[in-house]
Regions:
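Short acidic/His/Gly/Ser-rich catalytic and metal-binding motifs that mark active-site loops
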Residues: 169-173, 223-237, 281-286, 328-330, ...
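Short, solvent-exposed turn/loop segments enriched in Gly/Ser/Thr/Pro and often Arg
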Residues: 161-168, 219-222, 276-279, 322-325, ...
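N-terminal catalytic cores of secreted or lumenal carbohydrate-active enzymes
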Residues: 84-272, 293, 303
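Short, low-complexity, Lys/Arg-enriched N-terminal segments of secretory-pathway carbohydrate enzymes
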Residues: 1-28
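Substrate-binding and catalytic surfaces of secreted/luminal carbohydrate-active proteins
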Residues: 65-109, 215-217, 256-273, 284-490, ...
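Lectin-like carbohydrate-binding module/patch detector with strong preference for beta-trefoil
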Residues: 476, 481-619
Length: 672
């Protein structure tokens, strides 16, 4: 069964159920999910939203609150009892000045403690996205442009990412310097002919709507003749030799290629704001790829790319890395500290994927690496440059899960000094393509099979809860989240989840106990805390208790929990909310960050280092929040509740309080 061809409307989403696709995706996702939603995509009788076509001139369902509706404008997107309600206004919210402040369930905001400045949100103009845009009738193209770039009726995107040459989301591999060993690029296609048929027309239409759209480019691969071969690999745009794919003698030519590409786009009236030297430099992908080490990329920037850009295109913003969170801090240390590259680099770009893990882990791993990267050089920014849900196009509860993952990822990034967030494909076809290596994925807008209309996925609205209300120049401000649930809810745990220390909230993720065979189990689930080895050190992951033979020693006199010479610890000895629980070598002197207690009265596990009400949490806290002050001094609070129970809490700002709640699995944005 194909995607429904029913017309689209702003304020709706596609949550139709396709049992064939559900079955296929369930088979592809080999993971364990413990909880009420079950495993994989569950094909249930969902309400299929049938709405009339809405032209670009029609008002959005996102209303503007008037003075008699309350002091606070609020919008909520929810999926309860198989019914979606997207960007629904919650009216009548009013502050109580001097009201009694709750101490058990609250979110407090300190607008005077400010952090990074926001530089924007956006998506990618891939060839796949451009081809789908071109398939749509003109009036539907206008709707897409409104949905993404209009401030009043859309998501107010600020950024566009543009592949330099082909990527996996192209129909086939291509580049603009096909002549082998043309080191001076005399035969470079200065018209960038291939892109004039796809990407450039889409960009021009977007720029008509958003003239100040910030575009940044990223290459997936140089032409094959610029790349290294080996005994096991013949140079091609696909794949790469590791650890370095670019030939030493082609670095000057490759740097010149960047300059000529930027110049060619300028001749079409399209200017770039910035670039990265390479997409995912640590991954020798089966599609277009070129591996780099941080040291080699630093040398390429310092000796070749940086000087060429400074000469030909001064003022461009250069970001490095453009890969997963796992190693971002290492790349920042190397390149920021490099004697020639450092002066050309403005910041770091990164992706949401988790190296080598199942895709349900994307967006939840290693947020502390972003925090560490910020403090390596607080004067340089961090940009989330790619996120994408795979495999295929999701429906039903799995589509909502993917939207929640986006919301969680954006929230986690922003709370760890990230200045902006950019999605991957702006739109794709009904299969999640085209992709010439069959790496099919989801997108916020999915075309119907016949290509005359589109469906809006829930993730579109989760992005909009941030992008629409947090303009460029906004500042993140301090938030303390101390929500508390009256019912614990479904733990919704996954194999290999990490474990953290967070404010005690009464949820099922914070119920842990010591078993009779000396394991640490999440109560009423099959999961235990398990030590796993890394290339350097170890960490704690969730595993099914029946599959681990680890038995921990619980030292009554020291309150340490040890396995051989390793003790359960807090990462970096920190008690910051959300800090990871890990393992380190047991210290000679017993320290609080390696001391733990189990509280029988509430079934929780605590750290002796914490001076606040914090509990060991399997995964992460269900309630997350970020707050901002905009350039016109509006305040914005985004709250997401991933529990299966509603979150009731009090918002506290100065001497003003507001009692409110977020529905199960929902996201809200407050503006005042």
């Amino acid at each position: 069964m194909a995607l429904s061809s029913e017309s689209t409307a702003y304020g709706t989403s596609s949550l139709s159920t396709d049992e064939r696709l559900s079955s296929r995706s369930g088979a592809q996702r080999k993971w364990i999910k413990w909880g009420g939603f079950g495993a994989g995509i569950i094909a249930v009788g969902l309400i299929v939203l049938k709405t009339s076509s809405v032209s670009a001139s029609t008002s959005s369902t996102v209303a503007t609150a008037t003075s008699d509706e309350g002091d606070v404008t609020c919008f909520q997107s929810s999926f309860v009892n198989n019914v979606t309600n997207m960007m629904a206004p919650i009216k009548g919210l009013k502050w109580t000045l001097g009201g009694e402040k709750k101490t058990k369930s609250f979110i407090s905001i300190d607008v005077d403690t400010q952090f990074q400045e926001i530089i924007g949100f956006g998506g990618a103009f891939t060839e796949a996205a451009s081809l789908q845009f071109n398939r749509l009738p003109k009036h539907k193209q206008e709707e897409v442009l409104t949905l993404y770039f209009d401030k009043e009726q859309g998501s107010a995107y600020d950024f566009g990412r543009v592949p330099m040459g082909s990527c996996d989301f192209s129909v086939a591999s291509y580049n603009f310097a096909e002549t082998v060993d043309d080191i001076d690029l005399v035969n470079f296609d200065v018209n960038v002919t291939h892109d004039t048929e796809t990407i450039i027309p889409f960009l021009k239409r977007a720029l008509e709507r958003k003239p100040d759209l910030k575009l940044f480019l990223a290459p997936w691969s140089p032409p094959a003749w610029m790349k290294r071969s080996s005994s096991e690999y013949t140079a091609s745009m696909l794949g790469s030799v590791k650890p370095v794919g670019l030939r030493d003698d082609m670095r000057a030519s490759w740097a010149l290629y960047f300059s000529k590409f930027i110049t060619a786009y300028k001749k079409h009236g399209i200017s770039f704001w910035g670039l990265t030297p390479q997409n995912e430099p640590e991954f020798a992908a089966p599609w277009e790829a070129c591996a780099y080490t941080p040291e080699y990329q630093a040398e390429f920037i310092g000796e070749y790319l940086g000087p060429v850009l400074e000469r030909d295109h001064p003022g461009l913003t250069l970001m490095v890395y453009d890969h997963n969170r796992n190693n971002i801090q290492h790349w920042a240390k190397v390149i920021y500290g490099h004697p020639t590259a450092s002066k050309y680099v403005h910041g770091m770009a990164f992706h949401w994927y988790e190296d080598g893990a199942d895709r349900y882990m994307d967006g939840v791993e290693y947020p502390e690496h972003l925090n560490e990267t910020h403090y390596i050089d607080p004067n340089r920014f961090i940009l989330a440059s790619e996120s994408c849900n795979c495999p295929g196009v999701a429906f039903g509860k799995d589509a909502w899960f993917r939207a929640q993952r986006y919301g969680h990822d954006i929230m986690s990034d922003l709370n760890n000094h990230v200045a902006g967030w950019v999605d991957w494909n702006l739109l794709l076809d009904h299969t999640g393509g085209p992709n010439h290596k069959n790496n099919l994925c989801d997108a916020p807008i999915i075309l119907t099979e016949n290509g005359d209309d589109f469906q809006i996925q829930p993730m579109y609205y989760f992005i909009q809860h941030f992008s629409k209300f947090i303009p460029i120049g906004s500042r993140r401000v301090h938030v303390k989240v101390a929500a508390h649930f009256t019912k614990p809810g479904d733990p919704q745990l996954y194999l290999n989840y990490q474990t953290s220390l967070a404010t005690c909230d009464g949820s099922s993720r914070q119920a842990l106990h010591k078993t009779n065979d000396n394991k640490m189990q999440v109560t009423n689930t099959p999961f235990c805390l398990n030590m796993v080895p890394l290339s350097e050190g170890q960490e704690i992951r969730l595993v099914e208790c029946q599959w681990t033979q680890q038995t921990w020693t619980f030292e009554e006199t020291t309150q340490r929990i040890r396995l051989d010479d390793k003790c359960l610890s807090l990462n970096d000895k920190s008690t910051m909310n959300g800090v990871r629980v890990t393992v380190d070598k047991c210290e000679a002197d017993v320290k609080p960050h390696q001391q733990w207690t189990f509280k029988d009265e509430d079934g929780t596990m605590r750290s002796q280092a914490s001076t606040e009400n914090q509990c060991v949490t399997a995964g992460y806290s269900f309630v997350q929040a970020s707050a901002f002050v905009t350039p016109d001094n509006h305040k914005v609070l985004v709250v997401m509740n991933e529990n299966t129970e509603a979150a009731e809490f009090q918002v506290q700002v100065g001497d003003a309080v507001l009692d409110t709640e977020v529905l199960p699995g929902a996201i809200q944005t407050y503006v005042w």
